[in-house]
Amino acid sequence: MQLSKNPIKQTRNREKNYTDDFTMKRSVIMAPESPVFFPPPLVFSPTSVKTPLSSPRSSPPKLTMVACPPRKPKETKTTGSDSETVLKRKRPPMLDLTAAPTVASWCSTTRETAEKGAEVVEAEEDGYYSVYCKRGRRGPMEDRYFAAVDRNDDGGYKNAFFGVFDGHGGSKAAEFAAMNLGNNIEAAMASARSGEDGCSMESAIREGYIKTDEDFLKEGSRGGACCVTALISKGELAVSNAGDCRAVMSRGGTAEALTSDHNPSQANELKRIEALGGYVDCCNGVWRIQGTLAVSRGIGDRYLKEWVIAEPETRTLRIKPEFEFLILASDGLWDKVTNQEAVDVVRPYCVGVENPMTLSACKKLAELSVKRGSLDDISLIIIQLQNFLP
């Protein structure tokens, strides 16, 4: 009688083959969705504004923009098992926003670095601001940011524009907003200065948000983005948002929220949505428009555009000596850290010290959010308002 092969040995062989296959599959690293992790660095001439990533279908701005080769970023890796690629940027070229009436961004990574999947991006301009972005655990990085400062030392006012853009359903809307919103706002302000209309700073910001949204919808792309921006001009600070990105200011050590989160559960937002024929319901403890989206304002979201508006809320303040610093951040931070906690963490690094370390403060805030269980992308900018006093 012929004996059959050992069934235990066969089972073990099958288990080994399955384990090998599974190991190979899970070793694939997910690359970022977009080849551009952040917008490329730009240099503006006094005669133009044209963004390289804008679609031919978008309305071209009046001025001309010349793109320069990005500087090679410095990459470092942390020691230990959880290594991460860090992109660092310091000292951008001087920007003259008076000579060139547009807002220019130098914040970027190269395509090569983005394709390698940078986990962390750091940028700073000593004495003015620091940026820190950390990719979450849910997938590709969908946040973008924008920062530009006119560092004129002729005794005149310093001008600046900052923005944090939190994408959902992909990074295209956040990337588009980062590249175009500042230019659109500046175009509206330039129009007002030329006497074409009498729009104020707030109305120029509103016009910039609406135009950015309209232009993105013409692109035919999916997804959307929440936005929070800070425009500083002639000693005035205008903070705006659409969505749940938030701006918090330290006024003598006390946290003051300068924006309100636009969620469907808010009474005024719920009333507006229902008046337009939409509905809001609760899914797993989160209120969502039409059962899908958890924010009620932002750029994009074409399939919910009837209810998700790009209309920003803006608050304008004259910068005063008691205004210490401003934090702009995505909800990856604010979902886990309260406004006052954020101010308490940052203040020892920025106030009453000879050499402020705002980048270290950014890292501490992000680490606190991650420690408390945040899985989302975290992007934040800390702006030292004392250096923009009129």
Curated annotation (Swiss-Prot):
Record-level GO cellular component terms: nucleus
Gene3D superfamilies, A to Z: PPM-type phosphatase domain (3.60.40.10)
InterPro entries named in the record: PP2C, PP2C_BS, PPM-type-like_dom_sf, PPM-type_phosphatase-like_dom
Matches recorded under PROSITE patterns: PPM_1, PPM_2
Residue numbers spanned by region Disordered: 1-20, 40-85
Catalytic activity annotation: O-phospho-L-seryl-[protein] + H2O = L-seryl-[protein] + phosphate; O-phospho-L-threonyl-[protein] + H2O = L-threonyl-[protein] + phosphate
Sorted UniProt keywords: Hydrolase, Magnesium, Manganese, Metal-binding, Protein phosphatase
Gene Ontology MF term list: metal ion binding; protein serine/threonine phosphatase activity
Cofactor(s), by name: Mg(2+); Mn(2+)
Record field: compositional bias (Polar residues): 1-10
Biased amino acid composition, Low complexity: 44-61
Enzyme Commission numbers on file: 3.1.3.16
Annotated binding of Mn(2+) 2, by residue: D166, D331, D376
Residues that bind Mn(2+) 1: D166, G167
Cofactor note: Binds 2 magnesium or manganese ions per subunit.
Tagged with keyword Phosphoprotein: no
UniProt-recorded name of the protein: Probable protein phosphatase 2C 30
Name of the gene this protein is made from: PP2C5
